[in-house]
Amino acid sequence: PNPKVFFDMTIGGQSAGRIVMEEYA
């Protein structure tokens, strides 16, 4: 399975949401 890394990105000091990035090893 591919590990999923969750990045919490903040834009303008506000939470823009959670981005799910799938890294293919």
UniProtKB/Swiss-Prot annotation:
Which controlled-vocabulary keywords does the entry list?
Antimicrobial, Disulfide bond, Fungicide, Plant defense, Toxin
Please convey what the UniProt record notes about how activity depends on pH: Activity decreases below pH 5.5 and above pH 8.0.
Please give the record's induction comment. In seeds, induced by jasmonate.
Modification note: SBTX is known to be glycosylated but it is not known which one of its two subunits is modified; contains 5% carbohydrates.
Molecular function terms from GO? toxin activity
**Expressing tissues:** Expressed in seeds, leaves, roots and stem (at protein level).
Q: Does the keyword Disulfide bond apply?
A: yes
Biological processes, Gene Ontology terms = defense response to fungus; killing of cells of another organism
Instruction: Give the quaternary structure.
Output: Heterodimer of a 27 kDa subunit and a 17 kDa subunit; disulfide-linked.
What functional role does this protein have?
Involved in plant defense. Inhibits spore germination in C.sojina, A.niger (at concentrations >50 ug/ml) and P.herguei but not in F.oxysporum and F.solani. Does not inhibit vegetative mycelial growth. Inhibits growth of C.albicans and K.marxiannus but not P.membranifaciens or C.parapsilosis. Probably acts by affecting the cell membrane. Does not have urease, chitinase, beta-1,3-glucanase or hemagglutination activities. Does not inhibit trypsin. Injection into mice produces toxic effects such as dyspnea, tonic-clonic convulsion and death.
Q: What else is on record for this protein?
A: On the 2D-gel the determined pI of SBTX is: 8.2, its MW is: 44 kDa.
What is the name attached to this protein's record? Soybean toxin 17 kDa chain
